[in-house]
A protein has these predicted regions:
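Positively charged, low-complexity intrinsically disordered leader regions
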Residues: 8-12
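Short beta-strand scaffold segments in enzyme catalytic cores
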Residues: 28-32
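A short, polar/charged loop-to-alpha-helix boundary motif
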Residues: 44-61
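Generic structural signal for well-ordered beta-strand positions
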Residues: 38-39
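C-terminal binding/interaction regions
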Residues: 1, 5, 16-23, 65-161
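Generic alpha-helical structural element
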Residues: 2, 6, 42-45
Length: 161
């Protein structure tokens, strides 16, 4: 962005991501759906991209925030395996979409939310960090236009300056 002389007002999604990231000192991605800005932040079990897409699916399907789309019966074994194999402690976006597809076989609300994913095609998003390749590829496959700050996460740690 600096090279192109672009600031946080260039896209509507940049400023909300930066503000939330600075406030909470965690990586954040924001995305504009229609006129609304949706954010996803890193949690103990989700990548920011995964959190963003779950929040977007809830918004598009009108699912309240307190309703979980991912079943604990699916999440727990996945997280346990990641821990055992030392492949991280958060689910990536591709892993979350896989878990959602499994949950959709027994939960029609999740199935409807998955069907609404096509509505995010062409949306603008901004990350406060350099998104890892797996999440970035999946966001690209979902046809989301992504910009990123030049901040790396090192060893799953994030220091936003």
């Amino acid at each position: 962005m600096n090279e192109l002389d672009i600031d946080e007002t260039f896209l509507d999604v940049i400023k909300p991501a930066l503000e939330k990231s600075r406030k909470e000192n965690i990586p954040v991605i924001s995305m504009k759906i229609g006129r609304k800005i949706i954010t996803g932040k890193q949690t103990n079990i989700l990548s920011p991209a995964g959190s963003l897409i779950l929040n977007a699916m809830k918004e598009l399907t009108k699912i309240p925030d307190d309703i979980d789309l991912l079943s604990p019966n699916i999440l727990e074994p996945m997280l346990n395996l990641k821990h055992e194999l030392k492949t991280g402690n958060r689910l990536t976006l591709p892993e979350i979409l896989t878990a959602l597809s499994i949950c959709s076989t027994t939960n029609p609300i999740v199935e409807k939310a998955i069907n609404n994913l096509k509505k995010i095609k062409g949306c603008e998003a901004h990350a406060t960090y350099i998104v890892d390749n797996g999440d970035k590829k999946t966001l690209k496959n979902l046809k989301i236009n992504l910009t990123c700050e030049p901040e790396y996460m090192v060893n799953d740690e994030y220091n936003f300056e």
